Amino acid sequence: MEPPAAPSERSLSLSLPGPREGQATLKPPPQHLWRQPRTPIRIQQRGYPDSAERSETERSPHRPIERADAVDTGDRPGLRTTRMSWPSSFHGTGTGGGSSRRLEAENGPTPSPGRSPLDSQASPGLVLHAGATTSQRRESFLYRSDSDYDMSPKAVSRSSSVASEAHAEDLIVTPFAQVLASLRSVRSNFSLLTNVPIPSNKRSPLGGPPSVCKATLSEETCQQLARETLEELDWCLEQLETMQTYRSVSEMASHKFKRMLNRELTHLSEMSRSGNQVSEYISNTFLDKQNEVEIPSPTPRQRAFQQPPPSVLRQSQPMSQITGLKKLVHTGSLNTNVPRFGVKTDQEDLLAQELENLSKWGLNIFCVSEYAGGRSLSCIMYTIFQERDLLKKFHIPVDTMMMYMLTLEDHYHADVAYHNSLHAADVLQSTHVLLATPALDAVFTDLEILAALFAAAIHDVDHPGVSNQFLINTNSELALMYNDESVLENHHLAVGFKLLQEENCDIFQNLSKRQRQSLRKMVIDMVLATDMSKHMTLLADLKTMVETKKVTSSGVLLLDNYSDRIQVLRNMVHCADLSNPTKPLELYRQWTDRIMAEFFQQGDRERERGMEISPMCDKHTASVEKSQVGFIDYIVHPLWETWADLVHPDAQDILDTLEDNRDWYHSAIRQSPSPPLEEEPGGLGHPSLPDKFQFELTLEEEEEEDSLEVPGLPTTEETFLAAEDARAQAVDWSKVKGPSTTVVEVAERLKQETASAYGAPQESMEAVGCSFSPGTPILPDVRTLSSSEEAPGLLGLPSTAAEVEAPRDHLAATRACSACSGTSGDNSAIISAPGRWGSGGDPA
């Protein structure tokens, strides 16, 4: 593991709003706000108009959330707490009512006549408990102190957020819930000091006379209690004064969480170069920063690389058209015998065996894709719709359903390593399991379930394999069309709904107008929530809602309005989209290989255009293990622990798997030795880094050319100018096949092919020094697009940098080869090269 580096001016610092002029810094919350009496939360079930005809089994066909690799143990085991601990690999040590509202008719079945959502006979779908039952539970960074300068003698040590089972306490961290808890405390203290009993018919559960009589308290104790009550009321007023009329209460939590994450990332970025890059990746991806993005002006040399080919310019389409749509003709008889799982396959028995785990967490979607002939999305979508009886409930013709599924899957790019139909199928199946959570049984209507499943299926359709920021920085037509706001998410929605207009593809043709409008609104809200820059806002919204109910007396989460219901659904799809780290390790590692391959392909495009390479997109410097540990610690764990609070205890096994996977990647970091001295900034062969905010860890273009210049090799510019002649000779990275191919083999092959193509002496190649540390994980090489193979729907994007950067990539591979020549092929640190991405996103 890399030794901690001294803090520098290059550390991460987000521009978050500070106190207004003349306003003092907010005081820390009173100490007791971190521990509140535990209040169970119940999510009220909706009623069924046909409840007399539906048995309990029919209403809940998927009651338990099971893991695909779990063993049947009979009765549900006792509640266990997550073993997740605060990350210690980067810095420091571990730390731990109102009246009921009737649902509108277009939103699915209405409550039964005479049965109110508040009816006492409605059994709860959820009971939430925070804290531990058998062991201490350490939480995410959200439960750490919000202030580094909290030195008040009244403040307790907040380094540990362990809830005490003996005292039955909940931990409250969202500001609005803390304000409510504070007001309740003030009310209780007032009752005690004045001997005025609290009416039992009011909201507070502390009805009746105070538990302690004022006469039993000394004068000094009463005065101290009065002072503390006044201080608490002042704190509460100060919190309310900072609120702005146009901001929701959950924005208080969002602002707080962003501030805390900023502090954690700053610490992480100061520890090592790789930590700096991980910090920037998390900041750029998961924080919706409103500050302007400064794009440096390209040099004349770089500008030549950014000119799109003339053939691309001629293909420009009017802005009014939705790009990426293809005219497809699906042959075969859709009106005759319908396949059992919606797709034709000669391995139906094996497919049926895999689909026995359809309603379990951890289904091996890779095996499903293999047995379904690469049609994993169509197979999963059809099977789920059949199992939930949605085709009959909404009168969806089977042939229309099959036509839409096939058309939708064909609009996912098979040559994109991660965001392909395989990922869509995985998110769809995960959403299906989360909808079947026992805590949410009988909560959502059939139309809401249909909307959630449809949103999961289309949420990444026509994804080009690059990020929103890449599209914005390159002035793509999509970014212009959607004004730089959730560019890809808006495009996915447009394509998903546009495909419904294709011949015999409208699966919602028999819905009423109001049902279609309601479904469309829900789908739009859920897909837009998959924009990762909205992550902290979604997390703050959900946590505020959960904790607000914890500090209220009722503890009943009614979900009786659209805002609350869609909030849960949005977070559900978001959780499914970020569920890879919660799956069995063998599946998680495959997803990690794929996302890194996609990142590196984007990095190659950025390098070709002379752009700054995005964090984690440089295949020469990215740290896969550290990125995954940081991803879990700062993004995935806080989200899933909040979801686990909502559906407690149903997500306990998911949290356990998440921790196991995090430990595996963390142990891989420990096995990696520190980079050699000459690799550190300011070391041998490297100039000192500039004193400015800069996360980029790759060598500058000019420095690379100077240090890697080898006689007999053309320069990058010369290669580009002679591109037409060189393409036939350049190394074709798409020919590097086989998931078992090691980088050593790839490097040896590249050495031979490049020497043949450019006449470079082999001796001069091996004379180049090695800058890779022996323990650095070898990252997967990716398939690159040919010059005529552009990302559909993204006009003006040239091919990747394989042909242009072949000499430099060869040198990097040669250096990796000499550094790792003694590495065994069984070493877990070696990540196999994924090779070409075949049908359905599977490796060919």
Swiss-Prot record:
Binds 2 divalent metal cations per subunit. Site 1 may preferentially bind zinc ions. Pathway: Purine metabolism; 3',5'-cyclic AMP degradation; AMP from 3',5'-cyclic AMP: step 1/1. AMP binds at H419, H423, D460, D577, Q628, F631. The keyword Transferase does not apply. One of its GO terms (cellular component) is cytoplasm. Mg(2+) binds at D460. Mn(2+) binds at D460. InterPro entries: HD/PDEase_dom, PDE4_UCR, PDEase, PDEase_catalytic_dom, PDEase_catalytic_dom_sf, PDEase_CS. 3',5'-cyclic AMP binds at H419, Q628, F631. It holds the Pfam family PDEase_I. The record marks D69, A70 as: Cleavage. One of its GO terms (molecular function) is 3',5'-cyclic-GMP phosphodiesterase activity. Gene3D superfamilies: 3'5'-cyclic nucleotide phosphodiesterase, catalytic domain (1.10.1300.10). It comes from the Eukaryota. The modification Phosphoserine is found at S13, S147, S152, S160, S204, S333, S672, S674. PROSITE patterns: PDEASE_I_1 (PS00126), PDEASE_I_2 (PS51845). Residues 36-46 have a biased composition (Low complexity). GO terms for biological process: cAMP catabolic process; cAMP-mediated signaling; cellular response to xenobiotic stimulus; modulation of chemical synaptic transmission; regulation of adenylate cyclase-activating G protein-coupled receptor signaling pathway; regulation of cAMP/PKA signal transduction; response to xenobiotic stimulus; sensory perception of smell. Its cofactor is Zn(2+); Mg(2+); Mn(2+). The active site is at H419 (proton donor). The keyword Zinc applies. Hydrolyzes the second messenger 3',5'-cyclic AMP (cAMP), which is a key regulator of many important physiological processes. PANTHER family: CYCLIC NUCLEOTIDE PHOSPHODIESTERASE (PTHR11347). Belongs to the cyclic nucleotide phosphodiesterase family. PDE4 subfamily. This is 3',5'-cyclic-AMP phosphodiesterase 4A. The gene is Pde4a.
